[in-house]
Amino acid sequence: MIGLIQRVREARVEVDGVVVGRTGRGLLALIGVQRDDDEPQARRLLERILGYRVFPDEAGRMNRSVRDIGGGLLLVPQFTLAADTRKGMRASFAPAASPERGEALFHRLLGLARESGVPVEAGRFAADMQVHLINDGPVTFWLEARPSAA
C-alpha cells in the first residue's frame, strides 16, 4: 500500500463541485492500493502516516507528527499510484488492486484512521475528484507498507 503524503496548510477535495472532504493544517495523503495488499498493510501505512515526523519543532527541525500538532488528515484514493511506470510511455495498472479490493482496503484504512483520534476526512473512491491544496514547504514523502515475504 502506498501513501504519498503532503504537509498542507489546508486541503480539500471536491466531487461534482461539492466539497466532500477538507482539512486545515495537517496532511493530505493520496492512497494507492496494490494487488497483494491486505489489512496489515493498511494498519502499517496508517501508523506511518500518523507518526511520520514532517512538522517543525521549536528549532525548525521536522520532529513532529500530525498527531503531535493536533492536525487533520485528508485521505484521497488514487489508484494511479500503484502503476508500473518503468517501461514505455504508458503506465501499466497490473500492480494495482482490483477496484473492489482497492475500495474495501481504502475504506478499511479510513475506518482505522477515524478510530485514531485524529480528525479525518476523505475523498470518494472511483470518483472524478478535484483536489485543492496549499502545500506547506513543499514537504512531500512517499511511504509504502509492503506485504511480508512468506
UniProtKB/Swiss-Prot annotation:
A GO biological-process term: D-amino acid catabolic process
GO MF annotations in UniProt: D-tyrosyl-tRNA(Tyr) deacylase activity; Gly-tRNA(Ala) deacylase activity; Ser(Gly)-tRNA(Ala) hydrolase activity; tRNA binding
Reactions accelerated catalytically: glycyl-tRNA(Ala) + H2O = tRNA(Ala) + glycine + H(+); a D-aminoacyl-tRNA + H2O = a tRNA + a D-alpha-amino acid + H(+)
Location in the cell: Cytoplasm
Superkingdom of origin: Bacteria
Motif, Gly-cisPro motif, important for rejection of L-amino acids: chain positions: 137-138
EC identifiers of the protein: 3.1.1.96
Pfam family, one: Tyr_Deacylase
InterPro entries per the UniProt record, alphabetical: Daa-tRNA_deacyls_DTD, DTD-like_sf
Keyword line: Cytoplasm, Hydrolase, RNA-binding, tRNA-binding
Gene3D superfamilies, A to Z: D-tyrosyl-tRNA(Tyr) deacylase
Main localization, broad class: cytoplasm
Cellular component terms (Gene Ontology): cytoplasm
Domain notes: A Gly-cisPro motif from one monomer fits into the active site of the other monomer to allow specific chiral rejection of L-amino acids.
NCBIfam families reported for this sequence: D-aminoacyl-tRNA deacylase
Functional description taken from the UniProt entry: An aminoacyl-tRNA editing enzyme that deacylates mischarged D-aminoacyl-tRNAs. Also deacylates mischarged glycyl-tRNA(Ala), protecting cells against glycine mischarging by AlaRS. Acts via tRNA-based rather than protein-based catalysis; rejects L-amino acids rather than detecting D-amino acids in the active site. By recycling D-aminoacyl-tRNA to D-amino acids and free tRNA molecules, this enzyme counteracts the toxicity associated with the formation of D-aminoacyl-tRNA entities in vivo and helps enforce protein L-homochirality.
Subunit details: Homodimer.
Entry's family note: Belongs to the DTD family.
Listed name of the protein: D-aminoacyl-tRNA deacylase
Source species of the chain: Alkalilimnicola ehrlichii (strain ATCC BAA-1101 / DSM 17681 / MLHE-1)
